[in-house]
Amino acid sequence: MADKKVIFIAFAIEDVKQRDLLKGQSLNTKSPFEYIDMSVKEPYDKDWKDRVRTRIKRSDGVIALVSKNSLKSSGQKWEIQCAKEEGIKIRGIWAYSDDRTDLEGVYTKVWTWDNIKDFIDSL
């Protein structure tokens, strides 16, 4: 494999443990991607959106970890909208096996290595 793809992870802060699992996958030496984390625990500072947009523009794709928490996560919704505005491909991955929340405008699949790999290979 040539260069690793850069993947921006959009997630609700309540799903940080799931993000950590995905991060762990990206640290696997055979993983076809590296990830960018822009999570914030404090209210967004004034230039947060500019920094996020810059990082999304530098990314090959965005993986949105989708859960019931996504429905009320203004930061995650903004990141997804930003990716759409910048023409960056997005794939939703359900964060939990027992949660099939539908996030409008995001094509979402079950969290499997093959589904993640297929998305990354399509970039």
What are these model-predicted stretches?
Residues M1-R58, E86-I88, W94-A95:
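Conserved N-terminal substructure of TIR/SEFIR domains
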Residues K46-K49, K77, W113:
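Structural motif corresponding to alpha-helix initiation and N-cap regions
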Residues S59-D60, Y107:
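Short, well-ordered alpha-helix to beta-strand connector turns
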Residues K68-E85:
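Conserved TIR/SEFIR loop-to-helix hotspot centered on a Trp-containing motif
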Residues N69, I93-R100:
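Short beta-alpha junction loops
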Residues S97-W111:
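Glycine-rich, charge-decorated loop segments at or immediately adjacent to ligand/cofactor-binding or catalytic sites
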Residues K109-L123:
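C-terminal helix of von Willebrand factor
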